Amino acid sequence: LPISQEIPGVTNSDFLRSAMNARREKPLSLYQFIKAMDHATEDLEMDSNLAHRYLNEGFSGGEKKRNEILQMKLLEPKFALLDEIDSGLDVDALRIVADNINEMRKTKKEDFGLVMVSHYERLYELVKPTHVHVLVDGNIVVEGGFELIEKINNEGYEWVKKELGIELQKEDEDVVSIGVCGHKVTSNV
């Protein structure tokens, strides 16, 4: 999904309709698009006027995050990377975003893969990952399930450093956890 950049002069609805039609063999009619847009904005409890505003221009942090999920819902990618989608969301907005992510996971099943990056357990409590990985210097150093998130939440990352004997440089102290919420395995056998 695109980064939440402001694009003056391009309305949210024009951007989304163009992006949706670029992914389809036959373009959506205006009626079909409006129906899909209305349904998705209603699911995300977004103001319907958002469609007529310029893309991300003047959007609050929460509106940008919901707009990213709106794009995901309408574009229906096979794979999505949500980088700190919980950043700047209040409790209610986080629940709405998580509910919409879970709905996509439920309805798309094996046709949708998702990687979420967050520094906070609260997102992972609402969107339960199937796999959890801890990265240091771009390398996966620890893998597990939800219990790994609980351990990190309770003990921090200090145990990772001690257990694996990892010495982090000052600029490398930002360890990031990633929860993979779905994956599709294919084989060429």
Predicted regions and their residues:
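ABC-family P-loop ATPase nucleotide-binding domains
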Residues: 2-78
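ABC-family P-loop ATPase nucleotide-binding domain
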Residues: 154, 160-189
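Walker B catalytic motif
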Residues: 81-88, 92
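Conserved D-loop-proximal element of ABC-family nucleotide-binding domains
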Residues: 90-95, 143
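Conserved beta-strand-loop-alpha-helix hinge in the C-terminal portion
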Residues: 126, 135, 139-164
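Conserved catalytic/dimer-interface elements of ABC ATPase nucleotide-binding domains
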Residues: 115, 131-133
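Short beta-strand-to-coil loop within P-loop NTPase ATPase cores
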Residues: 1-7, 118, 135
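Conserved catalytic loops of ABC-family nucleotide-binding domains
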Residues: 100-120, 124-126
